[in-house]
Structures are given as structure tokens and as C-alpha cells.
Amino acid sequence: MFDKLQSIKDKYLTIEQQLSDPEVAADQNRFRKLNKEYSGLREIVRAYDNWRSAKQQLDETLAMQKSEEDPEMRALAAAEAEELQERLPELEQNLKILLLPKDEADTRNAIIEIRAGTGGDEAGLFAADLMRMYQRYAERQGWSCQTLDVSEGSVPGSLKEVSLEVSGHDVYGILKFESGVHRVQRVPETETQGRIHTSAASVAVLPEAEEVDVEIRKDDLQMDTFRSGGKGGQNVNKVETAVRITHVPSGIVVACQEERSQLQNRERAMKMLRSKLYDIKITEQLQSRADLRRSMVATGDRSAKIRTYNFPQSRVTDHRIGFTTHALPQVMQGELEPIIDALRMHDQAERLKAETN
């Protein structure tokens, strides 16, 4: 492992020199590519330097403990050595995690699709709650979150479905574990006898695809326009800015009506379509390589019940890892860090176990 770490550091230093070369700086494409690679290695190199520093300090402290004649100084050296011996395994574990193979899609932006499931109007209200939860979480992370398409439910404040585009640092890698069925248990406002109802909404998180990731033939597309905010067929009037695109071979349908111009809505709809097709492509590749792990945390199985939000008990339970918190109001306000951090740590532990085996 440490030979690999040293070679990574050597590569990091080489790229650092290249980035200061005026010829490289003049070639913007090459500069961006090198800078991205440099940024990707920085965390590993810093962790490796921390480990080396601690290891050197431990060696020096143990040597001092042996050679020191003053009992008081020997005791101080022994205490420092004990502290460093406890710290080194933690630093090594962190290095192992950083060396785990990266999912190329983790650094991408993401598209979140939320759909009301079983439970009627209450499911639609819960879908809207989930949308606000993710919007607030994105805001906490300093990400950009834009609505691509929304279909309102039959009661005020409810949603049939909504698509969000989230842009920022490592968005997909952080949000990918949110895919699945989210269940809510609470007393609806219309419930006169105080009975708890159970409803559900599904969440799908897709990595945003680039044009080079998937090939889409124009002949395979059917585009319809309609008036934003309402139903309509093609060419109803001159203010049809909303766009619906059907990918005929796959049957995938995407729509966008949030932008003011038809061109902008078409671009956003195509972005959604590319991401859906890219997601299918990646899933097929993983299955063909037998790399799709059975763990629900790993696969993001969208048919699996992953989490329950119990309002009477102020409890949120993630069933994949048995994680429970009684801070439901904070979670619904976007404070998802404890849950997401626990899921990511579990995934890292599972991957470390697989690497060891």
C-alpha cells in the first residue's frame, strides 16, 4: 500500500510542476484536465503526509524513550508514544478508504426524481416534503438546486412528481444512496379520529450525463410542446414553451416546463433524457461485470423500502443499516448529514471488506 502511496505522491508533485509550466497554462483543455487530476490526488497526498509525519514522530519518540536517562522525560516519551500508536491505525484506515476505487459518476451533478406512491393525497404531500428536504440540504451544502419539471397533485401543496437538478461538488456521490422508497407514518390533517396513515414516495437519483456518454439519434426522438402549467397538444398557440421528449426505442419520456423559453426547456429535457439513458447504460455495465453488489446501500434499488419517517415518534429509520435518529424535524429541514454520513461509512466498510477478501 505504501509503495502505491509514494507513487501517487510522485505523480502529484509532477503534475504540480506541470501546472506551473506556461505552455500547459496556455492549453486550457490540458490545464483543466491536469488541475482536476491534481485536485483528486490532493486529499490522498495530505493523508499520506500526515501518516508519514506521525510515523516519523513515533520512531523518534521510541528512540528517545530508550536513550533518555531522566525518568520524568522517559515517562513523557512513553505517554506520547502511546498516543501516536493509537493514532497511526486510524490514519492507516483513512488511507485505505481513500485508496478505494472511485466511482467515476460520483463527481457528477445529479438529477433527483420524486414520485408520490401509495397513500393518495398524503403521498403527494409527502413527496412535496421530500422535495423541500432535498432543496434545503442542497442549500446547506452550497449546491445549486433547480426544478426541471413538476406535476402538482389534486390537493394544494401536493405533488404527483418532480424532477430536480442539483449541481455542485461530488453531488451524485453524496446523494446516490437516497434512491429507493421512502415511507411516512403520520396523522393526516383531514383525519378526524387521529389514526396514523402510512404513505410512500419513491426517489431516484441519477448521475447527470454529458453528450459524449450516450449517443442519441434524432430519428429516435419525438418532441411535443405544450403550454407551461397546463395540458396541451402540439402547436396549440404561440406561447407553448414547455417541452416533452419521448425516446422511442426505450419508451422513456421526459418533460420540462420551468424555463421561459422553449429552447431552454428543450435543453433541460435533453439533459434529463441523457441522464436516464446513462443510468441504464451504467447499470447494465455493472451487471455484466458482476459488480452490482447485493447490498441495498450499494445498488440504490428503487423498488426497495429504504427509510421510514415516523412523525408521532419524531423518528427516522434507515432500514439498510439500522440507523435511527429522533431528530425528524431537523431531518425534514434538510439536516441529512448524520444519515448520509452513516450510509457512506457503511458503504466504505463494505468495500474495504470486499477488497480484503
UniProtKB/Swiss-Prot annotation:
Main location: cytoplasm
Annotated InterPro entries: PCRF, Pep_chain_release_fac_I, Pep_chain_release_fac_I_sf, Prokaryotic/Mito_RF, RF-1
Lineage: superkingdom: Bacteria
TM helices/strands, residue ranges: none
SMART domains the UniProt entry points to: PCRF (SM00937)
Compartments where located: Cytoplasm
Record's function text: Peptide chain release factor 1 directs the termination of translation in response to the peptide chain termination codons UAG and UAA.
NCBIfam families: prfA, PRK00591.1
Stored HAMAP family: Rel_fac_1 (MF_00093)
Record-stated family: Belongs to the prokaryotic/mitochondrial release factor family.
Protein name in the entry: Peptide chain release factor 1
Organism from which the protein derives: Chlorobaculum parvum (strain DSM 263 / NCIMB 8327)
